[in-house]
Amino acid sequence: MKTNNRDLPLDQFIEFALYDKVNGYYMKKNPFGKEGDFITAPNITRVFSEIIAIWVVTFWKSLGSPKKFNLLEFGAGNGEMIKVIIETLKNFPECFMNCNFQIHEKSDLLKEKQQLNLKSEKITWIEDIKKIEQNLNFAISKEQEIIEYSPGSFEYLKNICNLIKKNDGGILIIDYGYLDIKMHETLQAIKNHKYSNILENIGETDITYNINFDLFKKFTNQFDELSSIISNHKKFLTSMGIVQRAEIISENLTFSEKSDLFYRIRRLIDEKQMGELFKVMLIKKKKNKFKTGFEID
């Protein structure tokens, strides 16, 4: 890509197309849901976010139920996931009362929507993750919040890894990607739930890419005190009991409501849909042997 007769690196082009203050895709429209260009896992069914919340509680307990900790979500979209997480954690009062909920959001438009959707909750929006309070830290990154390969993405990951080294905790990364050592060309644009030309309608289409999780794993290996585990959507969510949770919920549903719920669950775990394509990665300290959600080989 060239601008003003000079080459523009791909990561800078994506940053401009998505986050330019005036023309960026995420700066001027809501991309989520039927009226947007794509649907994310938390918007398919709230059960997904409930499962993530239960995982957070389990991880928190494995670390000795610390009295203060930060739960940070990178790019909260319309705020639906962290909203459900907060609602679920209220069933675990000790965990809820000791948690500082935080969001790191680049888009001013989405930040406004999040603040409206979450106005009754105790949430802090942060600009610089280096300025997070010096407490135990949990971070959640989902769907396209870390670039496929760019200096910026690894700078984010480096900052989080340093926080984990210093304060303990971990980061849960959920995204579509692959584990091959060989790099894949996966860049694509999406508009109205359909593929589009990446160089057309810049600022009007979402740009997506599959994460190379092998690169993330190698990057993590540079930190002697840290380790990582990788699974996929199907194995992680199944191990965490998403089907059993859906069965409990469905007991009080009509036949059509029950059918719709299990259709949505299948969408998350079916290998031909999100079950295999989406990966789940946990980065934590080596001394922490926690593997909940990652037991299935």
Residue ranges and their predicted role:
Residues M1-F74, N78-K130, G241-Q244, I249, ...:
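Rossmann-like AdoMet
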Residues N135-D297:
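Long, Lys/Arg- and hydrophobic-enriched amphipathic alpha-helices
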